[in-house]
Amino acid sequence: MSTSASFAKEAQRTHKLAVAGMLSAVAFVLMYIEFPIPALIPAFIKLDVSDLPELLAAFALGPVWGVVVTLLKNVLFAILHGTSSQYVGELCNFLLGSVFAFTAGLIYHRSKSRRSALLGAVAGAALMAVVSVPVNYFVVYPAYVVVYGMPMEAIIGMYQAIRPGADNLMKCLVTFNVPFTFCKGLLDVLLCFLIYKPLSPILHR
């Protein structure tokens, strides 16, 4: 490999690291900006757009970089903010965010068109919503019962206050969490498409 080619490759790697670091910092800040939607879903589940930077990273740098930003975001949050869930919430955020970003980036980078970007992002949001069911059912909610000492019946009761027919955890997750997670992903997709082009000079060399 020539010296110039080696230098160009190193410069590209440095640029990717810098962009990933910047997007991780932005994602970390966005984790603080969240709000409940109590009429639609229990108040302990909040809406945020902290998955947006990892989606940008997946498109601009590659699917693996989307996962890297997701990881760094949650590590920063756990270290600087602390955790009230024994890191269960951060683990859930990492798993679901990684599915979202990696899927979107993988599909986009196969053809790199606006259509593939949209297809990848929507597919990522849909897969994230589907994966949220086993992650919440087998990991997150049982862990919350242990960490907070709250009976599962009390958690289900919060869902039933909105929809009485949600009388078991699986019904709660399918009825509330899946559509909420999908719509949350679609919000990130919309914002990504609005800001990606203006940010392109920063994201790309």
Predicted regions and their residues:
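Loop-helix junctions at membrane interfaces
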Residues: 1-205
